[in-house]
Amino acid sequence: MSSGGLLLLLGLLTLWAELTPVSSKDRPDFCHLPADSGSCKGNFQAFYYHPVHRTCLEFIYGGCEGNANNFKTMDECKRTCAA
């Protein structure tokens, strides 16, 4: 296969991987944890996956502790947990 064909194949595979939604069986277990602001008193915008609504929602993170269902951006949350 030519290098152009390989490059096209790589591009198509990358596009497929980006557009394929995360299935519930592939979703990490921590995506089902509740939002946890932690014990610190900070005021940081964060996002968590809400399994009942099957979407990512905003919450206020205190800055320490909490759990792994805590993302800095909506996009990161959606890529990791949302179907």
Curated annotation (Swiss-Prot):
Expressed by the venom gland. Residues 31-81 form the BPTI/Kunitz inhibitor domain. One of its GO terms (cellular component) is extracellular space. Residues 1-24 form the signal peptide. InterPro entries: Kunitz_BPTI, Kunitz_BPTI_sf, Prtase_inh_Kunz-CS, TFPI/VKTCI-like. One of its GO terms (molecular function) is serine-type endopeptidase inhibitor activity. Keywords: Disulfide bond, Protease inhibitor, Secreted, Serine protease inhibitor, Signal. The record marks K41, G42 as: Reactive bond for trypsin. Its main location: secreted. Belongs to the venom Kunitz-type family. Serine protease inhibitor. This is Kunitz-type serine protease inhibitor 161. It comes from Drysdalia coronoides (White-lipped snake).
